């Protein structure tokens, strides 16, 4: 087997599997509750929280490369322990590992964060992601750890669905003007991860879009692309009223982008309406 995608039924996992299949790779992917519809993929159920189950699957499939896209924001065992289980199995099997991490490992106190910046999480999810990175580095020194940001694409992301719900009145709430990230298109991210998987690079890489935008600005871009009313998207401040966490986290992807042929577009580019291109 060329590639095993852990967490293959999610937005990113599906895109990785689909791109790898189009490139001619033999692909297996795991799901926890329901398999996705990606032609030619060998779907396997997996509870990543079980170390023996992960080890047995990797021994059975014998993948050359493993991409771990599995996480659950509210579950330390899935996000942190699961990553440890995958890294241990990859190291034992001699498989190339690409572990997907998050900008949630940062507190947002710095103007920007490059690959040399140490994690300083301020949320349980960020702490779980930071712990996962530590486990991967300790168990598999040849692994790639790819930190990314908000993932957008094809109308299927949480952020896109939320914008549509707000615009239609199906959901209440606001989009924060002081919560800034570097959104990335799922197709760009998947291509970059597969490129890193096929390279000799190891260690931390930042893989996000080039534009730093607020949640509200991102919502307006999505609305503009999809022909929704931008005026229907309420704006608000996260500071002092929203959920705890970092406000502004800008990933500096300069080093990683210099190593890739895949171009990491910014939100202003990949969310441009088709009619305006």
Where does each model-flagged region fall?
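NAD(P)-dependent short-chain dehydrogenase/reductase
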Residues: 134-181
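Conserved C-terminal active-site "lid" loop/helix of NAD(P)H-dependent oxidoreductases
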Residues: 214-220, 235-277
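NAD(P)H-binding glycine-rich loop region in Rossmannoid oxidoreductase-like domains
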Residues: 42-85, 89-91
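Alpha-helical substrate-binding/gating segment
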Residues: 163-172, 180-207
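N-terminal Rossmann-fold cofactor-binding loop
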Residues: 29-37, 48
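Mid/C-terminal beta-alpha module of Rossmann-like enzyme folds, strongest
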Residues: 190-192, 198-243
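Catalytic helix-loop patch of NAD(P)-dependent Rossmann-fold dehydrogenases
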Residues: 105-146, 150-152
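N-terminal Rossmann NAD(P)H-binding glycine-rich loop of SDR-like oxidoreductase domains
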Residues: 1-23
